Amino acid sequence: AYRGQARGVYDLDSVQAVHLIHEMNQGLEVPGRKPGTTATLPPTDFCIGAAVSPFKQTEEELMLQYFKMEKKVRAGADFIITQLGYDMRKFLEVRRYLASRGFKTPVIGNVYVLSAGAGRVMNSGGVPGCVVSDELLAILTEEAKDPDKGKAKRLERAAKMVAVFKGMGFAGVHIGGFALKTADFVTIIKTGTEWAPRWRDFVPELSFGQPDEFYAFPPSETFEVSENEDDPVLRLAKGSKPLSYALMEKLHGVVFERDSLVHKMMGGYYKALDKHPTLAAVSHGGEFGIKHLMFGCRDCGDCALFDTAYRCPMARCAKQSRNGPCGGSATGMCEKCPTSKACAWVEIYRRLKSSGQLDLLREGYVPPCRRELADTSGWGNYFLYRDHSAPADPDPTGTDSGDDDAKPAKKAVAAKEPKTS
């Protein structure tokens, strides 16, 4: 890094990036040269891949990974690739979850030729999202004592993984590892293909779970995906609702619901403030003070509290993601601050689960934060239909702000429906 580490830039999260590329493939609509006009760019032809990290120990983290995977598919992902891991039951769960939701998206399995050295790094949490259990590390350490430092057994393990992925109906595999030669890839693919008829024999020796690990689905006797997989959410208990969240839900219904009387009144209030900059600044300062004290508000002007169960993603998520967590958390802790900061999305999950709204985490799409609204009133932008939540229809409250930019000409493109063929 030049004179220190550069600041992270999170203008788009992974779901938003997939959504953008999908729109590019359709022909992206952009502002035209003349004010008030648009132009459509020539369609691109990207094959869109998206990742999922199923090797999570807790319910919250695992289900959030599956939910975000679903969001990526709805946003336009053409295939899914897994993070590397060594628990075949978790690999299979990726396909079982997609089947339970009616998706037939191809899934690529990750085959990493794991050495003892790389295993030690991953076992200690040195590669976020990559899990190597103590049991597997002990095996790798013993294998490293062989004359070839365990290479033959590593290649054999990789070939067995190829065979199992083929048997479980995966669309393909990604083979990786350090210092592999062309001959090694040939050996893995050829041997794995030859062993494919015996793939079930290899499952037990490729199943390295974690202590007290949560699984979304019961064990499969056949290790195959059924066309009638049950939605795992239906098996989850709701849990208790935090009092603070219950109060915010009540407040939202009274003040922020689009058809409420208070909403109409607030629209008129902020419309009037538009004509008085000094009063608007005072009002904005008071709003920011309240929201900063209660939620850690960063004054982005395009508030996502409604979308994230009143846990501000700008303040609480290290990557400011609005559509779910990254894949780097472990045991509920943030990848960036693993010893001091809990993953913001764990609490968001618990809150929405307590109110029976988990579908918001897998079906809802939150557009990118509108940077042009930074340091402006988030409440004003909401009530005057300037932020990402603005509906496509004309202002139903009759409190038109008089600003042509207050209401977008059309809503963001809806996420596509599940693939069924």
Describe each model-derived feature in a short phrase:
Residues 8-59, 96, 100-161, 179, ...:
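Active-site pocket-lining/capping segments in soluble small-molecule metabolic enzymes
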Residues 18, 23-32, 179, 197-281, ...:
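Extended, intrinsically disordered, low-complexity segments
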Residues 59-75:
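Active-site glycine-rich loop that binds ribose-phosphate moieties when present
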Residues 72, 76, 109, 173:
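Conserved, mostly hydrophobic/aromatic
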Residues 78-87, 176:
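Catalytic beta/alpha-barrel core
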Residues 163-188:
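Charge-patterned, long linear interaction tracts outside catalytic cores
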Residues 277-403:
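Metallocofactor- and cofactor-centric catalytic cores in central/energy metabolism, strongly enriched
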